[in-house]
Amino acid sequence: MVKISDNSEIYDLIKDVTYLLGISIIEINTFRKRDEFKIQIVLYKSDNFSVDMLCDLHKMILLKLEAVLKYNVSLEISTPGINRKIKSDREFKIFEGKKIKLMLNNDFEEGFILRAERDGFIFKTEYKKVKILYSNVKKAKLS
């Protein structure tokens, strides 16, 4: 299978459905093999995100995708999980208020994302509150 890097078409097709339900699209991965199209979507909602809601979303999104795409579609929807690696600056905004493990130099430090900004975020530990630039983050994951 070949991984496809531009997922903007998929994002544009599903963003209205997720936005109305207060759900953030964290990640979209697409793979194509001949006439088969495999799509993996990671979604996040801060509260009341049940398995039933995921099942309903799967049905709605799959119908939209099958109506537009010219391939057989295999769809996998999941949530980020409790130890998700934060992969983009955009995710700091999505996970505001959440506890994370952050590596700046060679040590991990635990704290909370208080507020995400354009170039960084406010990180609060037990002893300090500091602005961290996204460019200084080596690793970050939910904790």
Swiss-Prot record:
For this chain, the family text in UniProt reads: Belongs to the RimP family.
> Which compartments does it reside in?
Cytoplasm
Residue ranges annotated as coiled coil are: none
Q: What is the species of this protein?
A: Borrelia recurrentis (strain A1)
Keywords of the record, alphabetical order, are: Cytoplasm, Ribosome biogenesis
Function as written in the Swiss-Prot or TrEMBL entry? Required for maturation of 30S ribosomal subunits.
Entry superkingdom:
Bacteria
User: Which InterPro entries does this UniProt record tie to the protein?
Assistant: Ribosome_maturation_RimP (IPR003728), RimP_C_sf (IPR036847), RimP_N (IPR028989), RimP_N_sf (IPR035956)
Does the UniProt entry include the keyword Cytoplasm? yes
GO CC term (a single one): cytosol
Question: One Pfam family, short name please?
Answer: RimP_N
Q: Name one GO biological process term.
A: ribosomal small subunit assembly
For whether the record's keyword set contains Isomerase, the answer is: no
- Its name, as the record gives it, is Ribosome maturation factor RimP
